[in-house]
């Protein structure tokens, strides 16, 4: 049996479908994520003011391989999960996505378990049980009914 995931872990999920696209989005959530952001993304330093913001720049994925990226910053406890949340928007190349995932994994970030963003939102008081049930119904729906 795999060890139970900790609420102290920083988690990561792709917010876009697998495959080539104009833009891809990786979403990270975790307690104190903003204080660790420069470990994950050295070229970005979110302001300590605790404000929502968008930072644009270039990220070096490999020596000589740079790409434009935007970092959306949502400080907790006012984010969707009640924790610090970062969204990284970048060109939707599967190769870039793979490089980013590997980078975050080496920094101790792990992939989410199914429903983990919703679970954290509930545990942090951002969603009530009725809202969680609505999310479950929407995710599990098979048609527009």
Model-derived regions: residue spans:
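A glycine-rich (often HGG/GG-containing) alpha/beta subdomain
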Residues: 1-145
């Amino acid at each position: 049996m795999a060890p139970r995931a900790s609420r102290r872990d920083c988690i990561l999920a792709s917010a876009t479908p697998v495959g080539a696209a104009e833009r891809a989005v990786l979403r990270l959530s975790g307690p104190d994520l903003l204080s660790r952001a420069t470990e994950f993304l050295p070229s970005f330093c979110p302001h300590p003011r605790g404000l929502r913001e968008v930072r644009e720049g270039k990220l070096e994925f490999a020596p000589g391989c740079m790409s434009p990226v935007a970092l959306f910053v949502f400080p907790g406890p006012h984010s969707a999960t009640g924790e610090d949340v970062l969204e990284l928007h970048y060109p939707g190349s599967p190769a870039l996505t793979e490089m980013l995932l590997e980078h975050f994994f080496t920094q101790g970030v792990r992939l989410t378990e199914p429903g983990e963003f919703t679970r954290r939102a509930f545990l942090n008081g951002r969603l009530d049980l009725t809202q969680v049930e609505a999310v479950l119904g929407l995710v599990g729906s098979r048609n527009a009914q």
